[in-house]
């Protein structure tokens, strides 16, 4: 497993991520493995996912640098399909691909279930650093869509409070602006994909760069309500067919 980590670090700041990730890899790759030079570590899921929390934060509450998203509390099916997508090449991020290579589907489901069951508190939203007109454009797209361009509102799939919908549609609040923008941009540019029919790719293809910036600014500025949680499966009729009910 360690031999797989021969990838090149893209920039010096990523070194602070690489070193704890390297140290944490063994428990994830070899469940139950003991250290030969020290006492046995408890074989808990929390110990096994140390490679995940090295970047995604304690309990998966999000990395401090605004790039690594929150995992805690997201639908287990969503997390599971993202792990599959990284492992199988539908999402492109080399450290994740190396980390997950060779891990079986059943173990990925265990990881997904663990993080889905974490309910760490959300931090307050970042201060909106965008003009009022930009924020209004983002609000309109998120809550109303743009029928003339065939753009459904974000709430039509992601729920009235943008908390997602079971089994596999994620919430959109509590995420950093840069992460939201980069992921929608990846959909638009074909660097992120999902099981067909890929409804998010269809939506992202219709968004302009200004649309993406406005959505990212507005969504990241919204406080997370106390009732924030995924809606039950089938709570709303999706505006388009999505592979595996929105494996996004």
Question: Residue ranges of each PLM-predicted region?
Answer:
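N-terminal secretory signal peptides that target proteins for export/translocation
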Residues: 1-15
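Bacterial N-terminal signal peptides
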Residues: 16-29
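Sec/Tat signal peptide C-region and signal peptidase I cleavage site
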Residues: 30-36
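Flexible coil segments in periplasmic/lumen-exposed cytochrome c-class electron-transfer proteins
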Residues: 37-49, 58-61, 94-166, 189-248
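The feature marks the first
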Residues: 39-89, 93
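Short cysteine/histidine-rich metal-coordination sites, predominantly Zn2+-binding motifs
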Residues: 69-74, 157, 170-178
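Extended intrinsically disordered, low-complexity coil regions enriched in Ser, Thr, Gly, Ala
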Residues: 75-97, 174-185, 189-198, 233-234
